[in-house]
Amino acid sequence: MKSENNLIWIDLEMTGLDHKADQIIEIATVVTDAELNVLAEGPVMAIQTEQHYLDGMDAWCTTHHGNSGLTKRVQESTITMAQAEQETIKFLKPYVPKGKSPMCGNSICQDRRFLIEQMPELEQFFHYRNLDVSSLKELARRWAPTVYSGYKKKGAHLALDDIYESIEELKYYRQNLFLPEFQQ
């Protein structure tokens, strides 16, 4: 089952967008094969965070994380940042050799920024490249507006739901943006 062609999908929820000031409060991972078939779902963890980080969230984060139940899960969590990092690495090791999978997801550069600051060992588990579904979305918006308008995200803003949505979105773009003769 371990393959350097497997893909690691990751999503983080944070208290804001500033990787220097805000905190990761949820992490989830999924491993797929190269054809985007799900091989395994990693642990989904709300990460304990000092209350002042939650109190400092902007209106968007306060509303969305509150409505989804994430804020309450974070307040009740006993999982530290270090524990979440190590549990995630432990989950990934049987599926992908270190340094082989690009970091996969939507707007994944933002997640990478937070990982560099708060989970550097996990960030180093990934290849330096990204497989960012939002890049395809931006190209479709500019060059194939019909394709762009054909996919609607639900936007749950829970880490695991967002990963599955990103995988489905990439499948959609694969089917609708790339020429059939180049698909396997």
UniProtKB/Swiss-Prot annotation:
Residues 7-170 form the Exonuclease domain. The keyword Cell membrane does not apply. GO terms for molecular function: 3'-5'-RNA exonuclease activity; nucleic acid binding. SMART domains: EXOIII. Its EC number is 3.1.15.-. It is found in: Cytoplasm. PANTHER family: OLIGORIBONUCLEASE, MITOCHONDRIAL (PTHR11046:SF0). 3'-to-5' exoribonuclease specific for small oligoribonucleotides. This is Oligoribonuclease. It comes from Hydrogenovibrio crunogenus (strain DSM 25203 / XCL-2) (Thiomicrospira crunogena).
